[in-house]
């Protein structure tokens, strides 16, 4: 499954996870991506969209 929003381009970000004793390990932060049916150029199409774009109304859902 794609880990990138097709509307805003938000994708995976890499960082560091710290334990209580401050030991470090690398980890990734993935966006909350949903596969929704949306209107794209007048036709319904399945797209990968982050929940921020869904909540803000940047995507017109197809029924």
UniProtKB/Swiss-Prot annotation:
One of its GO terms (molecular function) is structural constituent of ribosome. GO terms for biological process: translation. It comes from the Bacteria. Keywords: Ribonucleoprotein, Ribosomal protein. InterPro entries: Bacterial_rp_bL28, Ribosomal_bL28, Ribosomal_bL28/bL31-like_sf, Ribosomal_bL28_bact-type, Ribosomal_bL28_sf. GO terms for cellular component: ribonucleoprotein complex; ribosome. SUPFAM superfamilies: L28p-like. Pfam families: Ribosomal_L28. PANTHER family: 50S RIBOSOMAL PROTEIN L28, LARGE RIBOSOMAL SUBUNIT PROTEIN BL28A. Belongs to the bacterial ribosomal protein bL28 family. This is Large ribosomal subunit protein bL28. The gene is rpmB.
């Amino acid at each position: 499954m794609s880990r990138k929003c097709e509307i805003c381009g938000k994708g995976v970000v890499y960082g560091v996870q710290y334990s209580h004793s401050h030991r470090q390990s690398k980890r990734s932060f993935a966006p909350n991506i949903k596969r929704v049916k949306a209107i794209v150029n007048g036709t319904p199409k399945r797209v990968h969209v982050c929940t921020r774009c869904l909540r803000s109304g940047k995507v017109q859902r197809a029924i």
